[in-house]
Swiss-Prot record:
SMART domains: FBOX
InterPro entries for the chain: A_thaliana_F-box (IPR050233), F-box-assoc_dom_typ1 (IPR006527), F-box-assoc_interact_dom (IPR017451), F-box-like_dom_sf (IPR036047), F-box_dom (IPR001810)
Protein's name according to its UniProt entry: Putative F-box protein At3g22710
Source organism (scientific name): Arabidopsis thaliana (Mouse-ear cress)
Residue ranges constituting the F-box domain according to the UniProt record: 1-50
């Protein structure tokens, strides 16, 4: 018996267990299969039954674009959506976070949180213009300002002169403060996510070259956030900037993949692969500085490559609307 001879329900059941990266290759194989892949109901089934894959994406060469738009991109399907920004990006430094809420039909409705502040090195943090905006995919609406599900951000409390983790709940559209681990000395931090289930903090003290990776309990529960030390090692190279631009953690092998920039005149982008207790350490020259950056941008500022932990999903952007984001 061949696949065309099988009952449609059985065909759908088989395809729902195919990895997302393989589904992409099958879209052009059969008109019937392609119709199944575009069905929102199938996307939900595929999310729950297909094996979870993990990939590392790296942003290599930053481009200076004379535009005011944000792009949402699904690398798995190659679909994109361009979104017009409300506030002039030239006057502000912006950060974007993608999150979702669960609707009544147990489907995910996605939103984008934008935080922005005025870029003025001469002004104190208290004097800078600061704001938040929300964009909702379900209505393809314009940006709306926030006056006062979740995404997590490292933040600095000006009043208490301390660092905190801010959780933004996309359902209530409110911020909540979460505590960080207790560190014996001041260092630099980077926040990441492990398998979409746990938060991780990279803490690095440059004076001692000591690096620690802390991981929380599962963040998809209502339990109190607890931190535990997962990995500690030494960073052999001191010739790098104080902040790692991004990181990826292999929890089982206790290895961290970091992307950074040398602190010398070359400003080379380097990938560091570091294991626990100095068991493994290597540096890989990833990208030489691009001259166009120094022509168009401030020559005194360093520009980083970034690493992203990406799990392929059957995200469908149809006629500019995000139908389902798993």
């Amino acid at each position: 018996m061949t696949m065309p001879d099988l009952p449609p329900d059985l065909v759908e059941e088989i395809l729902s267990r195919v990895p997302a990266t393989s589904v992409k290759k099958l879209r052009s194989t059969c008109t019937q299969w392609n119709a199944i892949f575009k069905d929102e109901r199938f996307t939900e089934k595929h999310f729950s039954k297909a094996p979870k894959e993990s990939m590392v994406l790296m942003l290599k060469e930053h481009r200076v674009c004379p535009d005011k738009r944000l792009v949402v991109w699904n690398p798995c399907l190659g679909e994109t959506k361009w979104i017009q920004l409300k506030v002039d990006y030239r006057r502000y430094v912006s950060k974007f976070c993608l999150g979702y809420i669960q609707n009544n039909e147990s489907r995910r409705s996605y939103k984008i949180l934008r935080s922005w502040y005025s870029y003025d090195d001469k002004s104190s943090p208290r004097q800078r213009d600061l704001g938040f905006e929300i964009y909702e995919f379900i209505s393809d609406s314009s940006w709306r300002v926030l006056n006062d599900g979740n995404t997590y951000l490292l933040a600095y409390d000006v009043e208490e002169n301390s660092r905190v983790v801010l959780m933004f709940d996309f359902t209530t559209e409110r911020f909540k403060r979460l505590r960080l681990p207790h560190f014996q000395d001041v260092g630099n931090m980077d926040l990441s996510v492990v398998r979409e289930e746990q938060l991780s903090i990279l803490h690095w003290t440059r004076n001692t070259s000591k690096m620690e990776i802390w991981i929380t309990n599962n963040i998809d529960t209502d339990a109190t956030l607890l931190w535990r030390l997962h990995l500690h090692t030494q960073v052999f190279s001191r010739n790098c900037v104080r902040v790692f631009s991004s990181l990826y953690i292999d929890k089982e092998k206790k290895v961290v993949l970091c992307c950074n920039v040398n602190d010398d005149a070359t400003s080379k982008n380097i990938v560091y692969i570091i294991g626990e207790d100095n068991g493994y350490y290597t540096e890989i020259l990833f990208l030489l500085p691009i001259n166009i950056h120094w022509v168009l941008l401030d020559r005194n500022k360093k520009w980083y490559s970034s690493i992203f932990n990406y799990v392929p999903r059957l995200v469908q952007i149809y006629n500019g609307h995000l139908l389902f984001f798993s």
